[in-house]
Amino acid sequence: MKLHAPSFWWQKASFPALALWPLSFLYGRIAARRMRGSSAYAPAVPVICIGNVTLGGAGKTPTALALAKAALAMGLKPGFLSRGYGGTVRRPTLVDPGHHTAKDVGDEPLLLASVAPTVVASRRRDGARELERQGIDLIIMDDGFQSAQIRIDCAVVVTDSYKGDGNGFVFPAGPLRAPLAIQFQKLDMLLVVGKGDAAIPMVRRGARMGKPVLTAQLHPLPGPNLRGQRVLAYAGIADPEKFYRTLRELGADIVVARGFGDHQPLSAAAIAELIEEAEAKNLSLVTTAKDQARLRGSRRGGAGQDRAQELLAKSTVIEIEMIFDDPAVPARVIDQAQDRFRRSR
């Protein structure tokens, strides 16, 4: 099923949002109580959590990858902790990209595991224990800011500068995962991604509370020249428009754009339609690294696996990385987590 955030989430207060406000009030109370929980498991190593205040994508995974690479450069042994959204694995599992597929562990853990050991678990505290057994000396949580299952030494909250906090309402009336007040109490640093101005109110709120505000940009890695190419762009991510914006910046002519739900496996029919439409209109197929991970997951069983691999072979994959405006930021984040961990012992 295709799931995208409703448009009224990103508009001023509207009738649908106001009609849903009573449900949002209840959801917000529950979410705030959960975030105030005091029974968090305290791992024997520092923990950095990469989260966001809203539902959907903001750049958490690229941020987590950037921090892990910085940790490796510092001589540390980082490991990722994920719930493996979209996968079937529930017990703590060390991700093996050569064995597991997106159907098993989700798409994002496959990307994370290409850089550092990655454990998926339905219960984050169990996953943290598994990472400790693996000899990890720094845990990086991809999401989980609102869960309060694990003691966090440094919480970096990522926000999209083009969307900010939307209409400011908690789900389902808006995109917020919990009331902003409790989220800002718990975060340590606010990371604003991009050059938009929708996050300015959040930046001001953070400044009033003395929260450091970091800035960064998503940049595509070097790849094939797309300038002037007529493309069919397809993406099953939380914010396909972000991907399309990157393609336009690379000079691609997006003739057809096909958006699918975040973490949504492509059906055999959808795969066939993409291939056939691109061939009929003489378009180049272009997709994201997350979609590449899902398509690779079709290599084992399931209808249409041959077409899935055909689609992947015909697609140009655009990989991105998080570039901090201040290159020293990743090391500072890691240092803060280590310092707070030592003080808590």
From Swiss-Prot:
ATP binds at T54, L55, G56, G57, A58, G59, K60, T61. Its EC number is 2.7.1.130. The keyword Kinase applies. This is Tetraacyldisaccharide 4'-kinase. Disulfide bonds: none annotated. PANTHER family: TETRAACYLDISACCHARIDE 4'-KINASE, TETRAACYLDISACCHARIDE 4'-KINASE, MITOCHONDRIAL-RELATED. One of its GO terms (biological process) is lipopolysaccharide core region biosynthetic process. Pathway: Glycolipid biosynthesis; lipid IV(A) biosynthesis; lipid IV(A) from (3R)-3-hydroxytetradecanoyl-[acyl-carrier-protein] and UDP-N-acetyl-alpha-D-glucosamine: step 6/6. Transfers the gamma-phosphate of ATP to the 4'-position of a tetraacyldisaccharide 1-phosphate intermediate (termed DS-1-P) to form tetraacyldisaccharide 1,4'-bis-phosphate (lipid IVA). It comes from Allorhizobium ampelinum (strain ATCC BAA-846 / DSM 112012 / S4) (Agrobacterium vitis (strain S4)). GO terms for molecular function: ATP binding; tetraacyldisaccharide 4'-kinase activity. InterPro entries: LpxK, P-loop_NTPase. The lineage of its organism: Bacteria, Pseudomonadati, Pseudomonadota, Alphaproteobacteria, Hyphomicrobiales. Belongs to the LpxK family. NCBIfam families: lpxK. One of its GO terms (cellular component) is plasma membrane. Pfam families: LpxK. The keyword Iron-sulfur does not apply. It is an enzyme of class 2 (transferase). Keywords: ATP-binding, Kinase, Lipid A biosynthesis, Lipid biosynthesis, Lipid metabolism, Nucleotide-binding, Transferase. It catalyses: a lipid A disaccharide + ATP = a lipid IVA + ADP + H(+).
